[in-house]
């Protein structure tokens, strides 16, 4: 009689994905973040579901309903802070996951990579509409400023903005539809994550050396289930430390003031995980140019497979490209800091230089470094 996990139609899918999956024997801890993103997604959907049971998407009661959740609902404060900080954890894991993909050349699995970019865009959209829901000052003004960027689109811009708003300003209609989007998008993300996995399992995982490992693959279970479980424990420890000891560290104090259309906060800024893109957008003095730069800051990732010039896949043995990669990481941290600063000297020029450097490294310097390293290999 066949083993049930190999014969049962449902168990067979799980078996091929998580048990008997042939996996490279040498993948490092940087490969843990895929499973950690899955955990973050489940955490966000569960905490979000419980929050949705008590939240009301009406401009008059939204802020009060969040206060009610924190004060009156059993462990409501915990669920709310888990959800808010879970988003930060999600993006930290997401950015490390993308960084790993760039460092080890995983972007050469084009279908998996492109679906990953789509997942990133959807996650950013989900986080943006979710940030509007508590209806605090930064929620309201963040929504106003970011949606207003669409008005820069020629001809249809203004109509598009009013269509998204459901009126002539961010109001009740906007809040209601943003709540609807925030509810449905994670379910779309879950479906796309499965497609992401499907394409990954067509090719098999990459590894730190960037070379084929078919001859030495090991089953996913027990080796990588154990390893992933260790990652889960470490992530949850950091998560609970953040939620229980530093619950408001990553939030904005302005969001504890109810939304007031008549009073603009001195510095309007999105959540920390969007600041790098916000800084790139702000560094261009033209509105349409800023919107294009904002989009390109993410979509530039889609060009990486076509800009790969090196004979080696991974950066493990490429010192020039390695240096550029870490300069890129430092540049992104710099952009994140600049995005949170007011628009005044010297922050303007720092943001502009950092933005140019970001595109320069990805579009020109890394492909050039790949060609130089190819030459060095011949010496």
Swiss-Prot record:
Miscellaneous information on this protein: Heme 1 (or BL or b562) is low-potential and absorbs at about 562 nm, and heme 2 (or BH or b566) is high-potential and absorbs at about 566 nm.
Localization in the cell: Mitochondrion inner membrane
Protein name: Cytochrome b
Chain segments annotated as transmembrane: 33-53, 77-98, 113-133, 178-198, 226-246, 288-308, 320-340, 347-367
UniProt keyword Electron transport present: yes
Positions contributing to heme b b562 binding: 83, 182
Binding site for a ubiquinone: 201
Keywords: Electron transport, Heme, Iron, Membrane, Metal-binding, Mitochondrion, Mitochondrion inner membrane, Respiratory chain, Transmembrane, Transmembrane helix, Transport, Ubiquinone
Record-level Gene Ontology MF annotations: metal ion binding; ubiquinol-cytochrome-c reductase activity
Protein family membership: Belongs to the cytochrome b family.
Gene Ontology cellular component list: mitochondrial inner membrane; respiratory chain complex III
Lipid bilayer topology: Multi-pass membrane protein
Subunit structure: The cytochrome bc1 complex contains 11 subunits: 3 respiratory subunits (MT-CYB, CYC1 and UQCRFS1), 2 core proteins (UQCRC1 and UQCRC2) and 6 low-molecular weight proteins (UQCRH/QCR6, UQCRB/QCR7, UQCRQ/QCR8, UQCR10/QCR9, UQCR11/QCR10 and a cleavage product of UQCRFS1). This cytochrome bc1 complex then forms a dimer.
One Pfam match: Cytochrom_B_C
Residues involved in heme b b566 binding: 97, 196
Protein function: Component of the ubiquinol-cytochrome c reductase complex (complex III or cytochrome b-c1 complex) that is part of the mitochondrial respiratory chain. The b-c1 complex mediates electron transfer from ubiquinol to cytochrome c. Contributes to the generation of a proton gradient across the mitochondrial membrane that is then used for ATP synthesis.
Cofactor: heme b
GO biological process, one term: mitochondrial electron transport, ubiquinol to cytochrome c
Gene3D superfamilies registered for this protein in UniProt: Cytochrome Bc1 Complex, Chain C
InterPro entries: Cyt_b/b6_C (IPR005798), Cyt_b/b6_C_sf (IPR036150), Cyt_b/b6_N (IPR005797), Cytb/b6-like_sf (IPR027387), Cytochrome_b (IPR030689), Cytochrome_b_C_euk/bac (IPR048260), Cytochrome_b_N_euk/bac (IPR048259), Di-haem_cyt_TM (IPR016174)
Cofactor note: Binds 2 heme b groups non-covalently.
Organism: Geomys bursarius lutescens (Plains pocket gopher)
Matching PANTHER family: CYTOCHROME B
């Amino acid at each position: 009689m066949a083993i049930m996990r190999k014969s049962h139609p449902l168990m067979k899918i799980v078996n091929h994905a998580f048990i008997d999956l042939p996996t490279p024997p040498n993948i490092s801890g940087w490969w843990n973040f895929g499973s950690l993103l899955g955990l973050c997604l489940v955490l966000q959907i569960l905490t979000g579901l419980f929050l949705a049971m008590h939240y009301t998407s009406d401009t008059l009661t939204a802020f009060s309903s969040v206060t009610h959740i924190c004060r009156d609902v059993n462990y409501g404060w915990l669920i709310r802070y888990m959800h808010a900080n879970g988003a930060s954890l999600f993006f930290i894991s997401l950015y490390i996951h993308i960084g790993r993909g760039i460092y080890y050349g995983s972007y050469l699995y084009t279908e998996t990579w492109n679906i990953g970019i789509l997942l990133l865009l959807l996650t950013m959209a989900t986080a943006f509409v979710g940030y509007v829901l508590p209806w605090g000052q930064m929620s309201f003004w963040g929504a106003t400023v970011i949606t207003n960027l669409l008005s820069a689109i020629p001809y249809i811009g203004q109509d598009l903005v009013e269509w998204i708003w459901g009126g002539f300003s961010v109001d009740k209609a906007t809040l209601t539809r943003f709540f609807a989007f925030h509810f449905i998008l994670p379910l779309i993300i879950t479906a796309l994550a499965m497609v992401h996995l499907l394409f990954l399992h067509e090719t098999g995982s990459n590894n730190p050396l960037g070379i084929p490992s078919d001859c030495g693959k090991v089953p996913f279970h027990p080796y990588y289930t154990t390893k992933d479980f260790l990652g889960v424990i470490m992530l949850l420890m950091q998560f609970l430390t953040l939620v229980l000891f530093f619950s408001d560290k990553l939030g904005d104090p302005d969001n504890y003031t109810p939304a007031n259309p008549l009073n603009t906060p001195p510095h309007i800024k999105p959540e920390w995980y969007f600041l790098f893109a916000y800084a790139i957008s702000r560094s261009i003095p033209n509105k349409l140019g800023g919107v294009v730069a904002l989009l390109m800051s993410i979509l530039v990732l889609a060009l990486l497979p076509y800009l790969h010039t090196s004979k080696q896949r991974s950066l493990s043995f490429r010192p020039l490209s390695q240096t550029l990669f870490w300069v890129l990481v430092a540049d992104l941290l710099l952009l994140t800091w600049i995005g949170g600063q007011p628009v005044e000297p010297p922050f303007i020029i720092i943001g502009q230089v950092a933005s140019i450097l970001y595109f320069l490294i990805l579009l020109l310097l890394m492909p050039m470094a790949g060609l130089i390293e190819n030459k060095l290999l011949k010496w």
